C-alpha cells in the first residue's frame, strides 16, 4: 500500500484539487465513474443514513440520496476544501460534515448501519488502522462498501492499455486542467502501488470486516467490495 507519511501535504494537495476535481474525474474516466457510483450505491442497499468516508466532493452521498430520497448522510473527509465544495454546491442536501482522518474519527461506537468509501482506500496511510476504526463505528452486522480503482490482472488484454493510460494520459490531463501534474502522477502511483486483491482482502479480514460481495468493473479497472462487521 502506498504509504504517504506526510499527511498535511496530501491534505493540501486534495484541497488544491477541489475546484476542478469533478471535471477532471469525468474526463479521465470518460464519464464511467458516474456509472460506477450508481452501481456502487445499488450494491450498498437501503439505509436511513449513510456514513460516507473519504467523501471528497460528495458524489456517492449525492447518488445515494437520489436513489433513496428519505436518507441522509454524514460526510467524512480530511480535506476542508472538498467538503466546502459540497456545501456550496448542494446547500440543501441532508448532509452533516466531519473534517477528520478516517483513522481517528470523532464518532461514537456502534452507531452506523451503513458506510461507504469510494476512491479513498489507496490514499490511506494505514488501511488496517482505518478499517478497524470503521469497524468500531459500525453497528453489529453493519456494512461497509468500498469502491476503488484497481489494476487489471496481467493476463488481462486490457492490462497494457490501462498501464499506458495511467502513465501517459492521466498526468497530462491532470496538469492541463488543474495545473498540478504532481497530483495526477500521485493518482497513477497510488493505483499502481495498491496491493493485489488477496493482500487487500487479508487486511479486510484482520480489521474484523468480512467480504459478503465483490464485483469487478470494466475488466478490473475498478472493484467493489461489500464488507460486513
Swiss-Prot record:
GO biological process, one term: menaquinone biosynthetic process
GO terms of molecular function: demethylmenaquinone methyltransferase activity
Enzyme class name: transferase
Domain of life: Bacteria
Chain residues that bind S-adenosyl-L-methionine: 57, 77, 101-102
Disulphides: none
Keywords: Menaquinone biosynthesis, Methyltransferase, S-adenosyl-L-methionine, Transferase
Catalysed conversion reaction: a 2-demethylmenaquinol + S-adenosyl-L-methionine = a menaquinol + S-adenosyl-L-homocysteine + H(+)
InterPro entries (UniProt xref): SAM-dependent_MTases_sf, UbiE/COQ5_MeTrFase, UbiE/COQ5_MeTrFase_CS
Enzyme Commission no: 2.1.1.163
Pfam families attached to this UniProt entry: Ubie_methyltran
Signal sequence region: none
Pathway linked to the protein: Quinol/quinone metabolism; menaquinone biosynthesis; menaquinol from 1,4-dihydroxy-2-naphthoate: step 2/2
Family named by the database record: Belongs to the class I-like SAM-binding methyltransferase superfamily. MenG/UbiE family.
Alphabetized NCBIfam families for the sequence: MenG_MenH_UbiE, PRK00216.1-5
HAMAP family the record matches: MenG_UbiE_methyltr (MF_01813)
Chain's role: Methyltransferase required for the conversion of demethylmenaquinol (DMKH2) to menaquinol (MKH2).
Protein name from the UniProt record: Demethylmenaquinone methyltransferase
Gene: menG
